[in-house]
């Protein structure tokens, strides 16, 4: 089934060229089906790139999905035009009276700051508190996962001696859990972060279950036992070239970032990286949408 998006969203043309099934509002109303309403809180600087990455996988499931984009009122985006934000994004005041079947909270390049020093932290806390009663399940990505662990479960992040940057092998810990159905026992996922969370703190928390970890990258995938919160500390949604683009960007800014590990063939940035996590991203999104959103959400909120 398709994702339902605004007719003029720039990502629409890109996705259609990739043979991703997208549908605009005019066509969607002709189908007698209630779509899943998914809210995406996009905290990434390059919002259009993140939109495309997420929609690529949200559109690859048997479910019709209606997408709404959310931005922060307490933060001014420097890398996305005001026109794009005003056209395609809502503010929290505009959506907080509604119910959503699922929500995605993306990463954000603010991990060097304590949570309380992030300019939109209070607003994000309000959104996360609101989600407890108004969203069936939330998928948190990278810094968004760390923010959720801190806010909901009191588990803080800590700084790494060097950036966790590359594609790492992960071990599946609970293969019979719904979220990881179809996953291989070992699989790859990209990471790009300067901070981490403690495996021991997660394993000791009675409301959390660690589902996948890496010897080199640490915690990767975990969930609350009630299914309300799914957290991925890496970026399965990244395209094959994203880490290369981040590496080049850092060096253009004078940041001496190491070559991403296990990424470029022969560690040569001139060579095309291998895309070896795409199928597991598809599984993660389809399992989340099916088992944690579609199967759990009421057909009509209030029932």
Swiss-Prot record:
Transferase as UniProt keyword: yes
One GO cellular component term: cytoplasm
Pfam families xref list: HTS
Classification via InterPro entries: Class_I_gatase-like, HST_MetA, MetA_family
Record site: Important for substrate specificity: 192
GO molecular function (one): homoserine O-acetyltransferase activity
Binding annotation for substrate: 163, 192, 249
UniProt enzyme class: transferase
UniProt keyword Acyltransferase, yes or no: yes
Compartments where found: Cytoplasm
GO biological process: L-methionine biosynthetic process from homoserine via O-succinyl-L-homoserine and cystathionine
Site (Important for acyl-CoA specificity): residue numbering on this chain: 111
Alphabetized UniProt keyword annotations: Acyltransferase, Amino-acid biosynthesis, Cytoplasm, Methionine biosynthesis, Transferase
UniProt catalytic activity: L-homoserine + acetyl-CoA = O-acetyl-L-homoserine + CoA
Catalytic residues of the enzyme: 142, 235, 237
The EC number(s) this enzyme carries: 2.3.1.31
Record-stated family: Belongs to the MetA family.
Biological role stated in the UniProt entry: Transfers an acetyl group from acetyl-CoA to L-homoserine, forming acetyl-L-homoserine.
UniProt protein name: Homoserine O-acetyltransferase
Species of origin: Oceanobacillus iheyensis (strain DSM 14371 / CIP 107618 / JCM 11309 / KCTC 3954 / HTE831)
């Amino acid at each position: 089934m398709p994702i339902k998006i605004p007719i003029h969203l720039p990502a629409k043309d890109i996705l259609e060229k990739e043979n991703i099934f997208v549908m605009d509002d005019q066509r969607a109303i002709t189908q007698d089906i209630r779509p899943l309403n998914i809210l995406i809180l996009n905290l990434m600087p390059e919002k259009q790139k993140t939109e495309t990455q997420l929609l690529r996988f949200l559109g690859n499931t048997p479910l019709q999905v209606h997408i709404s984009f959310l931005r922060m009122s307490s933060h001014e985006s420097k890398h996305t035009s005001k026109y794009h934000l005003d056209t395609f994004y809502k503010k929290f005041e505009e959506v907080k009276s509604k119910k959503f079947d699922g929500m995605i909270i993306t990463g954000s390049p603010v991990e060097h700051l304590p949570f309380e020093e992030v300019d939109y932290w209070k607003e994000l806390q309000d959104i996360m508190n609101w989600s407890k009663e108004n969203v069936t399940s939330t998928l948190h990505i990278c810094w968004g996962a760390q923010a959720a662990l801190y806010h909901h479960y009191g588990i803080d992040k800590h700084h790494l001696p060097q950036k966790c940057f590359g594609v790492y092998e992960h071990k599946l810990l609970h293969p019979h859990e719904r979220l990881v159905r179809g996953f291989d026992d070992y699989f790859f996922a990209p990471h790009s972060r300067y901070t981490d969370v403690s495996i021991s703190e997660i394993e000791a928390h009675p409301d959390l279950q660690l589902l996948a970890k890496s010897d080199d990258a640490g915690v990767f995938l975990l969930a609350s036992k009630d299914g309300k919160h799914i957290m991925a500390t890496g970026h399965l949604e990244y395209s094959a070239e994203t880490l290369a683009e981040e590496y080049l960007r850092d060096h253009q800014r004078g940041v001496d970032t190491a070559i991403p590990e296990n990424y470029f063939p022969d560690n040569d940035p001139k060579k095309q990286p291998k895309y070896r996590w795409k199928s597991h991203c598809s599984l993660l999104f389809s399992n989340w949408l099916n088992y944690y959103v579609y199967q759990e959400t009421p057909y009509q909120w209030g029932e």
